[in-house]
Amino acid sequence: MSQLTHFDSAGQAHMVDVGDKAVTHRVAVATGTIRMLPETFALVRDGNAKKGDVLGIARVAAIQGSKRTSDLIPLCHPLALTKVAVEFELNEAGHSVRCTVRAETRGQTGVEMEALTAVQVGLLTIYDMCKAVDRGMVIGDVRLMEKRGGKSGDWVAD
């Protein structure tokens, strides 16, 4: 098993030095779900939520979240993102919305945290916009689905 990279030999937290790493194309895809009451799902699906276009605003929030990742995660490097794509999949039977984010950069470190943060912010925005009618929504199943590029190579979830 690999060692944790965000701690030095004395066990102190530090930001990893990526200065000598090659600049490569990096891609990460993350996903997560929010489950809600059938009535809440209908409001989201039909675009009838009191606060407006829930998924449109959640899409913009997810993109903004990806751009702010290094402000939120202490040892995360600031990145020049080259692409952030946000997709929502409505699951009528499960009364849920799946958010999938693909983040890309050309850089010296990966974009996994940006993709994961974007998913969480997108789902939290859905929660925020619908909480007046459903405080019991559940956010879950947030995970990295794949990462491409970099020294450690490609990885795809089982």
UniProtKB/Swiss-Prot annotation:
InterPro entries: MoaC, MoaC_bact/euk, MoaC_sf, MoCo_biosynth_MoaA/MoaC, Mopterin_CF_biosynth-C_dom. GO terms for biological process: Mo-molybdopterin cofactor biosynthetic process. Pathway: Cofactor biosynthesis; molybdopterin biosynthesis. The keyword Nucleotidyltransferase does not apply. The active site is at 128. Its EC number is 4.6.1.17. It catalyses: (8S)-3',8-cyclo-7,8-dihydroguanosine 5'-triphosphate = cyclic pyranopterin phosphate + diphosphate. It is an enzyme of class 4 (lyase). Substrate binds at residues 75-77, 113-114. GO terms for molecular function: cyclic pyranopterin monophosphate synthase activity. SUPFAM superfamilies: Molybdenum cofactor biosynthesis protein C, MoaC. CDD domains: MoaC_PE. Keywords: Lyase, Molybdenum cofactor biosynthesis. Pfam families: MoaC. Catalyzes the conversion of (8S)-3',8-cyclo-7,8-dihydroguanosine 5'-triphosphate to cyclic pyranopterin monophosphate (cPMP). Homohexamer; trimer of dimers. PANTHER family: MOLYBDOPTERIN COFACTOR SYNTHESIS PROTEIN A. Belongs to the MoaC family. This is Cyclic pyranopterin monophosphate synthase. It comes from Ralstonia pickettii (strain 12J).
